[in-house]
């Protein structure tokens, strides 16, 4: 089923909207929701619906980022190491940059 809602339409309240196809689409929808909510023109009920949708989109984006991070780790052969706070302070080589 194709999505036919226009960007200015009231968010549907059924909570069954499909997830976007990718991270970029989710982020764009999230930015639109935030702008509409900040605009102050939504009713309380519509704001709550938009908030719920936004929370779903945030979770989707986090999952997508975690998947990509895992793929990067695999491609790097698990050579990624966290930067310890002591390493940056004792290095001293790039302090003048």
Curated annotation (Swiss-Prot):
Nuclease keyword on record: yes
Which UniProt keywords are given for this protein, alphabetically ordered?
Cytoplasm, Exonuclease, Hydrolase, Nuclease
Q: What class of enzyme is it?
A: hydrolase
Gene3D superfamilies assigned? Exonuclease VII, small subunit
Reaction(s) the record says it catalyses: Exonucleolytic cleavage in either 5'- to 3'- or 3'- to 5'-direction to yield nucleoside 5'-phosphates
Cellular localization per UniProt: Cytoplasm
| Gene Ontology cellular-component annotations | cytosol; exodeoxyribonuclease VII complex
Q: Name one GO molecular function term.
A: exodeoxyribonuclease VII activity
Where are the stretches annotated Disordered? 1-22
Kindly indicate whether the keyword ATP-binding belongs to this entry.
Answer: no
Write out the GO biological process terms.
DNA catabolic process
Q: Write down the superkingdom of origin.
A: Bacteria
Cross-referenced Pfam families, in alphabetical order?
Exonuc_VII_S
Write the Enzyme Commission number(s) for this entry: 3.1.11.6
- So what does this one do? Bidirectionally degrades single-stranded DNA into large acid-insoluble oligonucleotides, which are then degraded further into small acid-soluble oligonucleotides.
* NCBIfam families referenced in this protein's UniProt entry, alphabetically: PRK00977.1-5, xseB
Indicate the family of this protein.
Belongs to the XseB family.
Give the quaternary structure.
Heterooligomer composed of large and small subunits.
Q: What is this protein called?
A: Exodeoxyribonuclease 7 small subunit
Q: Which organism is it from?
A: Burkholderia lata (strain ATCC 17760 / DSM 23089 / LMG 22485 / NCIMB 9086 / R18194 / 383)
- Identify the taxonomic lineage of the organism of origin: Bacteria, Pseudomonadati, Pseudomonadota, Betaproteobacteria, Burkholderiales
Which gene specifies this protein's sequence?
A: xseB
